[in-house]
From Swiss-Prot:
Pfam families in the cross-refs: Ribosomal_S3Ae
A GO biological process held by the record: translation
GO molecular function list: structural constituent of ribosome
Family of this protein: Belongs to the eukaryotic ribosomal protein eS1 family.
Protein name: Small ribosomal subunit protein eS1
Amino acid sequence: MAGEKAQKKGKEKWKEKTWYTVESPPYLGSKEVTVALGEDPESMVNRIVEVPISDLTGNFKKSNEKALFRITGCEGTKCKTIFIGHYIGDDYIRRLVRRRKERIDIIEDVKTSDGSIITVKIVVVSDGKLTNTKKSEIRKALTSFIVSKGSQLSYADFVRYLIGDDSYNDMVEATKNIYPLRKIEIRKSELVSLSGMQEPQKNEPAPGGEAIAQN
């Protein structure tokens, strides 16, 4: 009997919840990215939504990449979000490195033209062994490039750039006189601050928040 009562109570609680539509930010099209149940609008705030980048851009070559959004508020049953980062799946990175011989990791905080800060993590994989001098030159060139690029763009434009198609060709161009690299990926980005508002560097829910993964 106790089990039946608990089950009934759970069903009643579920019925009391409302379906909310979660949208990407305006700078990524204000697209409906998922739906989720919530007790009220306040219960939705700070939840994190994970979305395949291919769903946002239509580029299915990016099926290994996920964007992360944090819900900032709701208007009725529509939830608004901000972009807080993205990442490439670890399995893809491991396969990438296994097929080649050298890996270089670059991590840099980039400040955009409107004062936002985002941590950018780049992975470089070469087909052959690199000298320490070459590695240093590649790191320096890519760090200089991504910092300069970010400083020229607003946060919204830089987000579109990070998950778009142009970054790869631009990074290859930035290093072509050092070594003919064939694989350079922005493997992860993490929002540090946006318009003076501090954001957690880890892609985890804030206290009381809940992660939502899109199926």
